[in-house]
């Protein structure tokens, strides 16, 4: 209740301040002043002013006129002197405002400013007696009136959901966020320069495709009305780029968006950026050199040392990166030697001992890949090329000549995550056609991520494709690594989010705005949005339990220290919880359809803690989080029980 009241108070305060600012805006228009003028003059930037006048003495004025513009981020003073801090695209600078330095209109403009307004000034460069480099305005122009106030704690907006939904506010409020996206831009530029300097040509391939291919992933499906044709947003650029190799281009690359209709977690977003590159007359060794070269170049471009810190781990990017076979890593994980010749029964038994679920139809290669994915990848810290993938999980890679069960493929793994995937490309059209047929059989068996048969691609291979190496690098993950960000959302300007509760868009928003006669609706007071007439709940149990039985159930308040999606699971979230004992508790819960993991960090939840441990996806789950479930218009709805934050971890519930 206290939490709801606090939110309601904040909404009321926001509405009051916004109304005041809207009134100021209206008054300006009534006075014949446009608070959103078309023209502005900016000739100088703060960072250049700081460099040029670094030696200016304390208390010294110049006659040098500069013209700057920026957002008002601080304001103080009264009477005949005011101090205003503005921020432009490069840095912040103080405006030393003296009433005698300007006309009355300019002074009134400065007096009426609110935090967040965008201001243009012309003035002279001075240094105050206290040593603060400043601009003393001679004229001032309001360039944009901000009618919505900045967050109360301007320097350090911390609520993650607000930061992701309103990235524009996040960029205003947090210097480190702006720096992350500057570095992302530098990394992308470095990738392009590196590739071009190595003789690669950048090309563009279709985003809208008629075949689901190039990767094993679930696509977004749309309809092309003009041709009455079902289409997909691309899940990879691979097959079109290799058509370019067939056509005679020896080195091609593409940096672009990829779309996969799958889950969201710390390292996955439904749309993301990759670089794919293909080089004729090359192989895996050439792709290893490319991966090392471009990532090291990007790391250097943003000013990082060769040894970096990533989420508490020390990563050494220097020297030649290691290469290991997948079977070597799996051997370490299960504690005994494994090869592709190890009997299926033995592999399955070893996997089940580690808590993995193995399907009876799986082959040795599939089981080895599963053990590696679930248990091996996380053990890798420094950059490692994991090589020699089984054919079952590599439908586009070239087979070993001496063992067709293995392929010439590697994944680059750093800090337990994949950053690149590379093949010695399959160029035998008959072999490729057979693998497409096998993929279609898997699709017919219910695997909606399996590739479709691409007849035109097989036809292209029939004309002859030279031996080639190919690689795909996840740009977003590279940015995460080099900027030390834990979540992919922290390196995407506008990550995909679940719909905001109570927030309208499109026609509904326009109708609400028209009804309110404002540019956009005010913050709505908190009120129930559920139509309870359409709710169905499970009937109460008729069987009673005695108090002794009930008292044996240990319900406790727990605080979420960390939460992440479980690999290979679309529903499970892995919670690290503080239960008041001083030892972290792990509980898995199948609620990913309803919650994003990062949104739950810091929350206080209700758990039953004395259930016996139960393995889920190989991870022991010690207890259960309590949720409320009901049906609404035939669909199940789930709400995780969230407690007041003031309740301490470990508090017992009765």
Residue ranges and their predicted role:
Residues 86, 572-577:
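Short Gly/aromatic-enriched secondary-structure transition segments
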Residues 586-587:
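Conserved RecA-like helicase motor-core motifs
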Residues 564-565:
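An active-site-proximal beta-strand-loop segment
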Residues 1-543, 549-559, 581-583, 593, ...:
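Class II aminoacyl-tRNA synthetase catalytic cores and aaRS-like
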């Amino acid at each position: 209740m206290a939490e709801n009241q606090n939110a309601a108070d904040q909404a009321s305060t926001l509405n009051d301040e916004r109304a005041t600012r809207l009134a100021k805006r209206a008054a300006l228009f009534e006075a014949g002043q446009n608070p959103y003028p078309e023209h502005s003059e900016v000739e100088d930037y703060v960072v250049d002013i700081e460099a040029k006048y670094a030696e200016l003495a304390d208390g010294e004025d110049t006659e040098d006129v500069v013209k700057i513009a920026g957002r008002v981020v601080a304001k103080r003073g009264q009477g005949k002197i005011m101090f205003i801090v503005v921020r432009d695209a490069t840095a912040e600078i103080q405006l030393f405002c003296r009433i005698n330095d300007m006309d009355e209109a300019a002074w009134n403009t400065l007096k009426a400013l609110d935090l967040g307004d965008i201001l243009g000034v012309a003035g002279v460069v001075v240094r105050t007696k206290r040593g603060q480099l400043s601009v003393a305005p001679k004229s001032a122009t309001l360039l944009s009136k901000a009618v919505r106030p900045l967050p109360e704690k301007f320097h350090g907006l911390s609520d993650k959901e607000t930061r992701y939904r309103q990235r524009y506010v996040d960029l205003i409020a947090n210097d480190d966020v702006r720096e992350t996206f500057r570095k992302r831009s530098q990394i992308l530029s470095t990738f392009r320069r590196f590739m071009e300097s190595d003789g690669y040509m950048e090309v563009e391939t279709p985003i809208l495709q008629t075949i689901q291919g190039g990767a094993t992933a679930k696509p977004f499906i749309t309809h092309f009305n003009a041709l009455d044709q079902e289409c997909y947003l691309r899940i990879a650029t691979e097959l079109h780029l290799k058509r370019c190799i067939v056509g005679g281009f020896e080195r091609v690359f593409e940096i672009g968006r990829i779309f996969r209709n799958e889950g969201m977690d710390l390292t996955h977003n439904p749309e993301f950026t990759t670089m794919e590159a293909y080089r004729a007359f090359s192989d895996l060794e050439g792709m290893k050199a490319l991966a090392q070269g471009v990532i090291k170049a990007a790391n250097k471009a943003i000013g990082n040392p060769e040894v970096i810190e990533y989420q508490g781990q020390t990563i050494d990017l220097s020297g030649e990166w290691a290469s290991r076979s997948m079977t070597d890593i799996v051997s370490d994980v299960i504690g005994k030697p494994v090869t592709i010749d190890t009997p299926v029964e033995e592999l399955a038994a070893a996997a089940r001992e580690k808590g993995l679920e193995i399907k009876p139809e799986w082959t040795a290669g599939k089981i080895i890949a599963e053990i590696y994915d679930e248990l091996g990848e996380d053990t890798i810290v420094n950059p490692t090329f994991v090589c020699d993938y089984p054919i079952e999980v590599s439908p586009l890679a070239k087979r070993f000549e001496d063992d067709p069960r293995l392929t010439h493929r590697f994944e680059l793994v750093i800090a337990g995550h994949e950053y690149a995937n590379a093949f010695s490309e399959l160029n035998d059209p008959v072999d490729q056609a057979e693998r497409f047929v096998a993929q279609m059989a898997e699709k017919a068996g219910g695997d909606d991520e399996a590739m479709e048969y691409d007849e035109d691609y097989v036809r292209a291979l029939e004309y002859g494709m030279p031996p080639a190496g190919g690689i795909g690098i996840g740009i977003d993950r590279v940015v995460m690594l080099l900027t030390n960000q834990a979540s992919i959302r922290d390196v995407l300007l506008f990550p995909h989010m679940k719909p905001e509760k109570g927030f309208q868009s499109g026609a509904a928003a326009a109708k609400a705005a028209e009804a309110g006669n404002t540019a956009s609706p005010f913050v709505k007071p908190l009120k129930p949005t559920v139509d309870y007439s359409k709710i169905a709940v499970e009937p109460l149990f008729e069987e009673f339990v005695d108090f002794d039985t009930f008292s044996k159930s240990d319900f406790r308040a727990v605080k979420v220290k960390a939460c992440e999606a479980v690999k290979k699971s679309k529903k499970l979230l892995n919670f690290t919880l503080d239960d008041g004992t001083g030892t972290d508790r792990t509980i898995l819960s199948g609620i990913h359809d309803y919650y994003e993991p990062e949104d739950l960090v810091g929350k206080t939840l209700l758990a039953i803690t004395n259930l016996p441990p139960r393995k889920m996806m190989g991870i022991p789950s010690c207890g259960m989080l309590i949720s409320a479930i009901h049906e609404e218009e035939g669909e199940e709805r789930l709400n995780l029980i969230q407690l007041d934050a003031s309740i301490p971890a470990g508090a017992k519930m009765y």
